[in-house]
Regions:
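Conserved small/polar residues in nucleotide/adenosyl-binding loops
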Residues: 1-5, 309-310
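Short cysteine-rich clusters marking metal-coordination/redox-active sites
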Residues: 4-7, 25-27
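Cysteine-rich micro-motifs
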Residues: 18-34
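Short, positively charged, Gly/Tyr-enriched micro-motifs
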Residues: 29-151, 156-162
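Active-site beta-loop-alpha junctions of metal-dependent nucleic acid enzymes
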Residues: 131-132, 182-206
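Acidic/histidine-rich, metal-coordinating catalytic segments
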Residues: 209-221, 244
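Active-site proximal helix-loop segment of RNase H-like, two-metal nucleases, encompassing DDE(D)
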Residues: 251-255, 259-282, 300
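C-terminal domain-tail junction helix/linker
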Residues: 276-312
Length: 312
């Protein structure tokens, strides 16, 4: 039985967030509040607003969207077909090699095909080929069983779409270095974090023993973990190990800093390929570009930890 169950005070509507509404019990005689208050350091109680450093009252988040029912396999719109009218599959493979593997821009890819292979092709046709390839390969990449270990690490970074910040979420298996969850979103809320976690956990019936999920101090990760426990119960009950800041100020940061640096290096690797695009025109373009990059990173790119071979 939850301590809160013995309090009959109704919850007060406090805040409206993008994906949920925050309700709070403001009863100062609530057993949940008194239980937490007893655990507060006595020094903080003597300070003005000292107890405000802690979240003592019962808080309930009422989600307006069910992120556990949303389709993970969204595909880019308006992709061209694999029926070639002017070129063939060989030209398409050359476009993908220069654009994805070598990280060239669309225009430089078109220029490379003309200068090296004598093939005249527009940069828009290169983009169409990339979008078509993404439609074909994204379901495979998203649903592949990577046989994950018991340590996941996550982080988010941002890109620009028409000059506006858009966020990329990555979840990596620390043992195999594979990207097992990713998401493009126009916000930094808990919703896209849940979707990325769903992709990472989709082949697990329950969490492995000694499971660790390592992230930074951003609040979306603990909130997403709470929702997994609420949705699936004890089989997906886990705590977020938060590595905060740039220096090892505590034992947790000292022990788990290498995992945080691992996901930060992944961010830098992706940003290096993204930088040549000079941003995207729409979120569909960001989606297909990211899907192709994850496919390249997981299946084609040589990696130092595995003797410069690919991960799979």
């Amino acid at each position: 039985m939850c301590i809160r169950d013995s309090c009959n005070h109704s919850l007060a509507h406090k805040k409206d967030r993008k994906h949920f509404v925050v309700h709070k019990c403001v009863n100062t005689k609530c057993p949940y509040y008194l239980h937490n208050l007893n655990k507060v350091d006595k020094k903080d109680l003597k300070e003005d607003y000292g107890k405000n450093k802690y979240k003592l009252h019962y808080i309930y988040r009422e989600f307006q969207i069910d992120f556990f029912r949303m389709d993970l396999n969204t595909l880019p719109k308006n992709a061209s077909s694999l029926k070639f009218s002017k070129h063939d599959q060989h030209v398409m493979s050359l476009c993908l090699t220069y654009k994805v593997n070598l990280g060239l821009s669309l225009r430089k890819t078109a220029q490379a095909l003309k200068d090296i292979h004598g093939i005249c092709i527009s940069h828009q046709q290169v983009a169409n080929y990339c979008k078509t390839a993404s439609v074909c390969i994204k379901p495979f990449v998203d649903n592949y069983d990577y046989k994950t270990g018991n340590v996941f690490t996550a982080d988010e970074t941002y890109i620009k779409i028409r000059g506006i910040k858009t966020y990329i979420w990555f979840i990596m298996d620390a043992a195999k270095r594979s990207v097992i969850g990713y998401q493009v979103s126009d916000n930094r809320g808990v919703g896209p974090c849940i979707l990325a976690m769903r992709m990472a956990f989709q082949h697990l019936k329950e969490l492995p023993k000694n499971f660790k999920f390592i992230a930074d101090g951003y609040s979306a990760y603990p909130l997403a973990a709470q929702q997994f426990f609420h949705e699936f119960g004890d089989k997906f009950k886990f705590e977020i190990t938060q590595v905060i800041g740039l220096t090892n100020d505590n034992e947790v940061s000292k022990e788990f800093r290498p995992y945080k640096q691992m996901i930060e290096r992944l961010n830098r690797t992706y940003k290096a390929s993204y930088r040549k695009t000079n941003g995207f025109d729409n979120i569909d373009g960001a989606n297909y570009d990211l899907a192709l990059w994850v496919a390249y990173y997981n299946f084609l790119r040589p990696h130092k930890p595995v003797s410069y071979t690919h991960l799979r």
